[in-house]
Amino acid sequence: MSKTSKYLLMIGIYLFLSLLFLIGIECGLRAFGYGVDLDHLFLQTANGKYLYLNKNRRYFTQSQATNGNVEFFRKKKQKNTFRIFVLGESAAMGFPYPNNISFQRMLKYQLQKTNPDKDIEIINLALTAINSYTFYDFAQELVHFEPDAIFIYGGHNEYYGALGVGSNN
């Protein structure tokens, strides 16, 4: 065997062993359940009847997760429920004002006043520092929860925000 062949064989063996090591680490971490589940848009409460937004999902790490409103809603939509999801950025979240005076609270009040026979459910999924890429991603999954409407209050972060001109991604 020539010197070049031995050299290439050794490089191949080192690369194979390195890859095998990384695969072993990955399998071990998965087997022991390390990390968090980022696949689901919503997480369940302990009793499994209610859902709430998984803020860490795909977009932010645990330390960077934005502080959205924690809105619980029934997993199964009730017969007499009118369900609206609100997607948006910090303005839709109500920032910088308290949650109880944000537009979805006022909308819920007005809808309950005009439709007293309906159970009005407005779930605000707004997060800071997101844009229409996130809205699109959320909306694809929201249709499975039988919304009667999806309100999108966004646009502020399209130009200067995530994946905009001010982004480094």
What are these regions (language model features)?
Residues 10-27:
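Hydrophobic membrane-insertion alpha-helices, especially the h-region
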Residues 35-44, 133-169:
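Interaction-surface signature
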